Amino acid sequence: QRQMCIRDRITTMFGNGGIFCWYSYVTPLMTHVAGFSENSMTFIMVLAGLSMTVGNLMGGKFSDQYGAARVVKYTQVIMASGLFAIFFAASVSWLAVILMCICTAGLFAVSAPQQLLLLRNSRGGEMMGAACVQVAFNLGNAIGAYAGGLPIDAGLGYRYPALVGVFIVLIGFVAVSLYSKRESASLSRI
């Protein structure tokens, strides 16, 4: 059970951290690469917020239908794919906005099932589990922002944080895949 809690934290930290690699630098990407004006960023951020709300609702609903681990796993695939597409398509303004909405929806679609997994694996210490999921989320935010800034500091440009984010999300994907394999094996023994 302790290994599963650690895996849940890794899944949360890196799965979300990959999005923060890119999202921490979304304004310069949208203004310098996609070609939006600074004034349009308010509306673009409203779209990101609406996407987060929709993603949160979808993540909870799909977790009830398909299971939390499965939702986390597939949502992280969508997030990694969105980040990969952003790397290549950020200069197409309308596509950059659509991909932003997909990634921000994914960021919040994955949150409820991640919390559910951590609470489920924290039996007897649910309050500590709830605190740990928030710590993991915040660490992911910090790690993602730092890692996303490295290619910018190296002069590679504002597309590259998304590419770094792909690899970080994939770490979370591997962790949740190991969890879901173990969960499937334990269910098949019942």
Where are these regions (language model features)?
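Short, small-residue-biased leader/transition segments that mark boundaries at the very start
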Residues: 2-6
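Extracytoplasmic gate region of multi-pass secondary transporters
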Residues: 7-46, 50
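Small-residue hotspots at the loop-to-helix junctions and early N-terminal turns
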Residues: 38-46, 127-131, 162
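Residue-level signature of mid-helix packing/kink "hotspots" within the transmembrane helices
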Residues: 49-57, 141-142
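Helix-to-loop junctions at the C-terminal end of transmembrane segments
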Residues: 55-68, 152-153
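C-terminal transmembrane helical hairpin of 12-TM major facilitator-type secondary transporters
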Residues: 69-114
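A late C-terminal transmembrane helix in Major Facilitator Superfamily
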Residues: 120-158, 165
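Multi-pass alpha-helical transporter architecture, strongest
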Residues: 166-190
